[in-house]
Amino acid sequence: MRRIDPNKLELEERVVAVNRVAKVVKGGRRLRFSALVVVGDKNGHVGFGTGKAQEVPDAIRKAIEDAKKNLIEVPIVGTTIPHEVIGHFGAGKIILKPASEGTGVIAGGPARAVLELAGISDILSKSIGSNTPINMVRATVDGLKQLKRAEDVARLRGKTVEELLG
């Protein structure tokens, strides 16, 4: 899979979560901040990243840099996704279903950020299991990675799109 150049896209950033994390040392606790950020161009490209630093703005900056390195392309049909898919990560699972136009993005917090920034405006989703922001984002991205266009599936099977869709 080829890498997507973030400089050629107009990316929008959304901070999904900021956590205060502690490392316990002999003299007490060392506090740092961990940030989870989703970036996307609302036109079929989305990515997420994490960053950790002493201060919140630095953690967010690092997370944005990381997210730009992890961009994926999402096949979109009209305003929704081509087919139903289930994304997994750890104990988190998310079901993504295509929806008719005008439905809107029906998704909880972290998954909503990923889907909106990917440019999907009509979708149904249900998260099952772990609902921590990082697991939800990773499961959603996993689901989006599994999506295939009808043309790609037809080419893989050596058929035409008409034969495939019947």
UniProtKB/Swiss-Prot annotation:
The superkingdom of the source organism is: Bacteria
What are the alphabetically sorted keywords of the record? Ribonucleoprotein, Ribosomal protein, RNA-binding, rRNA-binding
Per the similarity annotation, which family is this?
Belongs to the universal ribosomal protein uS5 family.
What quaternary arrangement does the UniProt entry report? Part of the 30S ribosomal subunit. Contacts proteins S4 and S8.
**Gene Ontology cellular component terms for the protein in this record:** small ribosomal subunit
The family database entries (PROSITE patterns) matched by this protein are listed as: RIBOSOMAL_S5, S5_DSRBD
Cited function: With S4 and S12 plays an important role in translational accuracy. Located at the back of the 30S subunit body where it stabilizes the conformation of the head with respect to the body.
Which protein is depicted? Small ribosomal subunit protein uS5
Q: Name one GO biological process term.
A: translation
Q: Cross-referenced InterPro entries, in alphabetical order?
A: Ribosomal_Su5_D2-typ_SF, Ribosomal_uS5, Ribosomal_uS5_bac-type, Ribosomal_uS5_C, Ribosomal_uS5_N, Ribosomal_uS5_N_CS, Ribsml_uS5_D2-typ_fold_subgr
State the organism named in the record: Geobacillus sp. (strain WCH70)
Which GO MF terms does the UniProt record name? Answer: rRNA binding; structural constituent of ribosome
HAMAP family the record matches = Ribosomal_uS5_B (MF_01307_B)
